[in-house]
């Protein structure tokens, strides 16, 4: 039987096992549990499982659960340990697929979609905190990108695997997703760091930490929380309305719409690894600035182009954003916050900020979309504006800090006498 040990022994193999387990967790709980639902929506309505209004109501369950899970993740881990909590959450997400194969009632379905969201939020808070401390410092960005590659694979799978499963039937599609999740849960089961290995890493972190009370979080950390929230606002329109924009907004065929969604999935696969690589080589702050600039331009470009090749290119760039910003934000926290425990707290707060604004944005965009007669351009303009504000805020804080530092270094007239 395969067991996990501290990665300092035959170490490198164990590190990759930990990363593989993290990838499986993000794939099951977010990649599939959230994004595989989108292509199932027409079939849920067409098969008369639920009405169109009920399906929209059920769509919110996962986002609400994600926020609950982000808040509950660390308290659960404090009772069960990180490894046991991650296994439990993967089982919960897997069970939700099988449960949703039987639409007993709206309450039943909503409850299981809510539980799948709770699993996703808890895993997002815990998975990096469980795996990354075992990774060499020079590879943390790339490793976090590999972990959250699962989100991108889930987005891509929503455009490829789900249509195949739907050809077998709606109930079979849910069961098929459950079987895939069960397989991934089994693959990851023994890949998590052992309790002894985690204890050793935590002890080393405590030994290397500065004595005294933890330092309060500085302005740059709170800026990151705000940026991460604005990123959530910026990614929702493409994530929810992209295919509808291409097919109904631009008059393209359903086939073109499906191809565009596949391109979004390609970007989602590339994003975590590329962004993690950038974090390792450019630093997290510079990488975030670069990504925000490129994303703001790409999202704004959706409003301006009617060329399908250019649209496909923009969609690849935009698709890299939802899963790619996770390793970037995580790397920025590691730059700003000392100590493993404080980093976990900061990451949990960042995830809660993201989850809150993602849920609010999803509701807000729906209100705007219904209020303006179903025009998509305004949604993408708001999204581009939110991303631009995140970039401007970062540059603004840097300028303020630079002026403050210059003022402190300038000697007063009395000091020169």
Question: Which stretches of residues belong to each language-model region?
Answer:
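Extracytoplasmic gate region of multi-pass secondary transporters
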Residues: 38, 220-262, 272
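Intracellular juxtamembrane helix-capping segments at the cytosolic ends
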Residues: 122-135, 324-338
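A membrane-interface helix-boundary motif in multi-pass transporters
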Residues: 164-179, 367-387
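Helix-breaking motifs and short loop linkers at transmembrane-helix boundaries and internal kinks
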Residues: 49, 81, 102-108, 251, ...
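Paired small-residue
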Residues: 107-115, 309-317
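Cytoplasmic helix-loop-helix junction between adjacent transmembrane helices
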Residues: 112-150
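A late C-terminal transmembrane helix in Major Facilitator Superfamily
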Residues: 340-372
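Helix-loop-helix hairpin linking two adjacent transmembrane segments in secondary transporters
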Residues: 145-193
